[in-house]
């Protein structure tokens, strides 16, 4: 390695093969803050980093199309400055199986920039055929990585850590143990070395990617993507992971279209698209601070959930159940027949039972208020489509605890088993289609210009799930309910009438024993009528 007149490192790259590849091998390959020039010109040429540089005699038969920089030492590469291709633009590949650390790195006059922990494999003509990735991490820190001087940036690595910004025209990261075809990007999943990393791709809160197009692909089984940073594309964002996607509350994923395929999608951040958000995962969870915004939103999985905090909701359910039990015990204490008391001790014991039950009730009530206050302080998750919202779940759709499903036009919710709206809002400014064997609406609101589907065409059932409801857990045919589309919950006819039952008795024929004791038979036309049982 030489130096230009201003001290910038100057690499006189090797002559290209018949396949157009300049293959350069180093014990160590590091780029200092002042940068480095890869000389791809036979004649003296002007550069941004080093001014005029002398010609590279190795280029006497033609320049390289691809410049490969292979590291063999077992030590990671540090890219702390820009790499500039002098002369004709070429693709630049930095390959180090032991890792690459970027802190202020970048590219100038580069066709395609590739950072990889893979080992290059060449064809018989010396062309670069594949990159075999089995280990290593590419990490971006500090001043980040500016690849806007390249047509595209590709990172091929076992795992990636993004702790700073990445800027590119087009940016792609492929993680996992893979053999990747250099020309087409086609990949074959292989077995990695040295055990699995914790996650395939980790984007910290201070990290981010900014490009016209972004694609992130993780192939290693069970490994996912964790992002608390920012992914912004003027065009499409594609994210595919064999494991889970966890977008934390400070995370932002935003593009013209956002497409996600993962084993599990768990969102606490913002996922937004000008046109369409499409998520396909076994379980899709939008919770707490989670926001899904798009022109259209399409979700497909086994279970789709939109709720604040499931653990806190269950805690509230337990607290309410305990309060109900305390209320029943207090009623029992008050319900003792004081006319049967025969001593002062009986009255004293009665008062003590009431006092004990009252204290227990107050304690349980405070517990409910505490959990409720905690939930009230939490933000509510939202899935909102300016146009159409479509949810297809093989098992269930859950919208709970102040969450909201919204569509500016039509909404289609389909579930193999249940659609649950519990203390939440489902609103469509167009037509709403609900298709599921069981639709549960507890302290929730449905609102739509027109509701169709399961409620009007299917012989489906509705389960009552309101806390302390006397019929909670029981399932009834939907035609036993009224106000299904009112937006304020449904009413079960049986429950409503039973509320008045204690005030009336139904006239019945006396039993044989009662007639024998002197009771008079009742005219048949009177049997079944109600009669007030109060004065």
Per-range role (PLM):
Residues 135-139, 191, 195-200, 222, ...:
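Binding/recognition "hotspot" determinant
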Residues 1-233, 240:
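Solvent-exposed adhesion/ligand-recognition segments of exported proteins
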């Amino acid at each position: 390695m030489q130096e230009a007149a201003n001290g910038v490192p100057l690499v006189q790259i090797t002559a290209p093969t018949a396949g157009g590849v300049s293959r350069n091998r180093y014990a160590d390959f590091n780029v200092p803050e002042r940068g480095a020039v890869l000389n791809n010109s036979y004649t003296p040429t002007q550069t941004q980093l080093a001014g005029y540089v002398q010609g590279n005699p190795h280029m006497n038969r033609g320049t390289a199309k691809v410049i490969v920089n292979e590291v063999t030492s077992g030590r990671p590469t540090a890219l702390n400055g820009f790499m500039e291709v002098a002369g004709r633009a070429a693709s630049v590949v930095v390959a180090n199986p032991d890792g690459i650390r970027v802190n202020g790195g970048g590219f100038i006059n580069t066709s395609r920039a590739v950072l990889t922990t893979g080992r290059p494999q060449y064809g018989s003509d010396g062309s670069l055929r594949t990159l075999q990735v089995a280990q290593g991490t590419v990490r971006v820190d500090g001043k980040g990585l500016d690849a806007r001087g390249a047509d595209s940036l590709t990172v091929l690595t076992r795992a990636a850590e993004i702790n700073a910004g990445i800027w590119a025209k087009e940016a792609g990261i492929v993680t996992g143990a893979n053999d990747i075809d250099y020309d087409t990007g086609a990949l074959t999943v292989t077995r990695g070395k040295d055990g699995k990393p914790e996650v395939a791709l980790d984007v910290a809160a201070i990290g981010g990617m900014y490009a016209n197009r972004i694609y992130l692909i993780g192939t290693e089984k069970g490994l996912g993507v964790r992002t608390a940073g920012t992914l912004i594309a003027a065009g499409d964002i594609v994210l595919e992971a064999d494991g889970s996607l966890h977008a934390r509350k400070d995370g932002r994923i935003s593009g013209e279209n956002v497409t996600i395929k993962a084993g599990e999608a768990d969102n606490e951040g913002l996922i937004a698209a000008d046109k369409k958000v499409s998520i396909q995962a076994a379980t899709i969870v939008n919770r707490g601070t989670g926001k899904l915004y798009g022109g259209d939103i399409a979700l497909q999985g086994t279970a789709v959930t939109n709720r604040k905090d499931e653990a806190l909701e269950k805690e509230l359910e337990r607290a309410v159940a305990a309060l109900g039990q305390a209320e029943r015990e207090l009623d029992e204490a008050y319900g003792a027949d004081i006319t049967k008391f025969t001593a002062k001790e009986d009255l004293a014991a009665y008062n003590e039972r009431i006092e004990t039950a009252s204290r227990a009730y107050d304690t349980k009530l405070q517990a409910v208020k505490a959990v409720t206050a905690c939930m009230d302080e939490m933000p509510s998750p939202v899935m909102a489509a300016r146009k159409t919202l479509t949810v297809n779940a093989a098992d269930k759709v859950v919208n709970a605890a102040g969450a909201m499903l919204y569509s500016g036009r039509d909404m289609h919710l389909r579930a193999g088993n249940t659609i649950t709206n519990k203390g939440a809002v489902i609103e469509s400014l167009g037509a709403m289609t609900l298709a599921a064997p069981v639709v549960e609406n507890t302290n929730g609101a449905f609102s739509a210009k027109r509701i169709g589907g399961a409620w009007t065409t299917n012989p489906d059932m509705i389960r009552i799930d309101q806390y302390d409801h006397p019929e909670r857990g029981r399932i009834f045919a939907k035609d036993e309910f009224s106000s299904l589309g009112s937006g304020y919950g449904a009413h079960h006819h049986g429950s409503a009438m039973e509320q008045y039952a204690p005030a009336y008795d139904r006239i019945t024929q006396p039993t044989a024993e009662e007639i024998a004791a002197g009771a008079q038979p009742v005219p048949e036309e009177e049997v079944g009528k109600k009669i007030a049982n109060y004065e």
